[in-house]
């Protein structure tokens, strides 16, 4: 009997080792809202595969639920902000962000820059609170983690990895102008045919659009390297006790798990330590709550429209709400609208308001005809996954770009939240519902998203386990990160070759002049003789 139980335990241990790269200890550094929701999907899978996952969260963290259904360890470090203060700051900045006038490039990005710097100041203080807390750092060192899984948008995970001397893997959607991806990850984004994020361009650019794209690249490079990065560089140098930069420290990431997909992104060059895992949170629809299911079924052949502007937009003016409600009341479809505000006066009988909706499950229904969205990445991927055409009403950040991508692929119509009329919204809905090309185009994207040899979630987990198993993945990191900008573009080599050519031309010219002078001199002597 003892031998039998020993054999069972051995098989369990070997199963864990071979199926999950040996059960390891994962330390997680994450952000809030959609950032956390994406990482949580991966963490659930890691826990199911036997790994021990510890989330490092500030005392002000908003969304982390210690009573979540899956087993996570939570390491809370104290910070000066309370949850209420932190949430109020986020909501105030989001409102300010969505209200910025987008007509002027310089005005829009200067105000956006201020907002981002304020967020960076908050997260830099969070990072300081962690690394300066001797009790927390001692506990982390004694825990002997195998890997850090961090969101690259919120710096600090790489600093913790350096202090704990362990490898780290990034999760990232994007950074403005792809600045960190290019300078730290070595990812190649030729501005001649790859539009940088936040430019709202497609890969089919005119000459002036390519000029605009280059201006965006230069602007974001200047923004990051000349301004905000200085504070991070100084902070990291002080903590590590040697001169360093944020870009250099982030460049040591073993794997970059980009929350992107070729069904969404425009084609561009790739690197071996970068993988696209966009849409990893998407899954088949689950049954709806009874009341919601009855409302959906009552739509008959006309079907339903799903409407959500995301989790961080909690209110809108009565005027805007009534503009939207008026348009929705005129369509034959039933509408499920995620709305946490006062009931609009113009709300039609075909529209129901919900403070929360199971968005993925609604988009997966055969009766769903269209999705009105703000263009958040998670919602976009759910719409692609289930093949639902979109009406995009982007508000801020990457949302205009996301909708621009879908519009370029013929899967969406775009409207402006601040200027659209009821007629505009009504016509947009009629277009995506009644024009079959929108459904056909988004179904093509859906097929591409589904037709992958390994699903995005499984690839993400594989790479985390791979790094744990091999103690890193340095063999996949390109040497470009070790080069200066002029070495990367071979300007020193070009300069050297030009100097060589110039030297040869100079020597040959001098030699020819010397020969000419010699022969001319001999000719004069011959005439005299």
Swiss-Prot record:
UniProt topology in membrane: Single-pass membrane protein
N6-succinyllysine found at: 135
Region forming the signal peptide: 1-24
Pfam families: UDPGT
Residues carrying a glycan: 315
Tissue expr: Expressed in the liver, breast and kidney.
An example Gene Ontology biological process: estrogen metabolic process
Compartments, as annotated in UniProt: Endoplasmic reticulum membrane; Cytoplasm, Perinuclear region
InterPro entries documented for this protein: UDP-glycosyltransferase, UDP_glucos_trans, UDP_glycos_trans_CS
TM region(s), chain numbering: 495-517
Location, primary (coarse class): endoplasmic reticulum
PANTHER family assigned: EG:EG0003.4 PROTEIN-RELATED (PTHR48043), UDP-GLUCURONOSYLTRANSFERASE 2B10-RELATED (PTHR48043:SF86)
Entry protein name: UDP-glucuronosyltransferase 2B28
Similarity remark: Belongs to the UDP-glycosyltransferase family.
Catalytic activity: glucuronate acceptor + UDP-alpha-D-glucuronate = acceptor beta-D-glucuronoside + UDP + H(+)
GO MF annotation list: glucuronosyltransferase activity
GO cellular component: endoplasmic reticulum; endoplasmic reticulum membrane; nuclear outer membrane; perinuclear region of cytoplasm
Keyword annotations: Cytoplasm, Endoplasmic reticulum, Glycoprotein, Glycosyltransferase, Membrane, Signal, Transferase, Transmembrane, Transmembrane helix
Highest taxon of source: Eukaryota
């Amino acid at each position: 009997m003892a031998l039998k139980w020993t054999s069972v335990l051995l098989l369990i241990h070997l199963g864990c080792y071979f199926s999950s790269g040996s059960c390891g200890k994962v330390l997680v550094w994450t952000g809030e809202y959609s950032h956390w929701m994406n990482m949580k999907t991966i963490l659930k899978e890691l826990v199911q595969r036997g790994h021990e996952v510890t989330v490092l969260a500030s005392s002000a963290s908003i969304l982390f639920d210690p009573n979540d259904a899956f087993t996570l360890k939570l390491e809370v470090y104290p910070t000066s902000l309370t949850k209420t203060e932190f949430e109020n700051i986020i909501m105030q900045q989001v409102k300010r962000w969505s209200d910025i006038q987008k007509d002027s490039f310089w005005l829009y990005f200067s105000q956006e820059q201020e907002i981002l710097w304020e967020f960076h100041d908050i997260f830099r203080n969070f990072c300081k609170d962690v690394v300066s807390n001797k009790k927390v750092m001692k506990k982390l060192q004694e825990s002997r983690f195998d890997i850090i899984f961090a969101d690259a948008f919120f710096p600090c995970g790489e600093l913790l990895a350096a202090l704990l001397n362990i490898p780290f893997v990034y999760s990232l959607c994007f950074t403005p102008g792809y600045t960190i991806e290019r300078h730290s990850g070595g990812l190649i984004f030729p501005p001649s045919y790859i539009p940088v994020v936040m430019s709202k361009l497609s890969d089919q650019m005119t000459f002036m659009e390519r000029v605009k794209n280059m201006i965006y690249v230069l602007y974001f490079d200047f923004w990051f390297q000349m301004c905000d990065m200085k504070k991070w560089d100084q902070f990291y140098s002080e903590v590590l006790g040697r001169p360093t930069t944020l870009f250099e420290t982030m460049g040591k990431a073993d794997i970059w798990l980009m929350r992107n997909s070729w069904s969404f992104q425009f084609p561009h060059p790739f690197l071996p330590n970068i993988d696209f895992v966009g849409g990893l949170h998407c899954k088949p629809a689950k049954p709806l709550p009874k009341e919601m299911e009855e409302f959906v079924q009552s739509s008959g052949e006309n079907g339903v429209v799903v409407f959500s502007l995301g989790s961080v937009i909690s209110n809108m003016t009565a005027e805007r709400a009534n503009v939207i409600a008026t348009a929705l009341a005129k369509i034959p479809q039933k509408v499920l609208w995620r709305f946490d505000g006062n009931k609009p006066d113009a709300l039609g009988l075909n529209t129901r308001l919900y403070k929360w909706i199971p968005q993925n499950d609604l988009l997966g229904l055969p009766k769903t005809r269209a999705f009105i969205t703000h263009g958040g990445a998670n919602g976009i991927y759910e719409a692609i996954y289930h093949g639902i055409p979109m009406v995009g009403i982007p508000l801020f950040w990457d949302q205009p770009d996301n909708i621009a991508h879908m519009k370029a692929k013929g899967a969406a119509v775009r409207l402006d939240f601040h200027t659209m009329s009821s007629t505009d919204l009504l016509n947009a809905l009629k277009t995506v519902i009644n024009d079959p090309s929108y459904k056909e185009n988004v179904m093509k994207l859906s097929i591409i998203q589904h037709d992958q040899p390994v699903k995005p979630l499984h690839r993400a987990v594989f790479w985390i386990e791979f790094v744990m198993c091999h103690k890193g993945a340095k063999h996949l990191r390109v040497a470009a990160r070790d080069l200066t900008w002029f070495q990367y573009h071979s300007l020193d080599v070009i300069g050297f070759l030009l100097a060589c050519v110039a030297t040869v031309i100079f020597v040959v010219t001098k030699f020819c002049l010397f020969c000419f002078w010699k022969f001319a001199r001999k000719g004069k002597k011959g005439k005299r003789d």
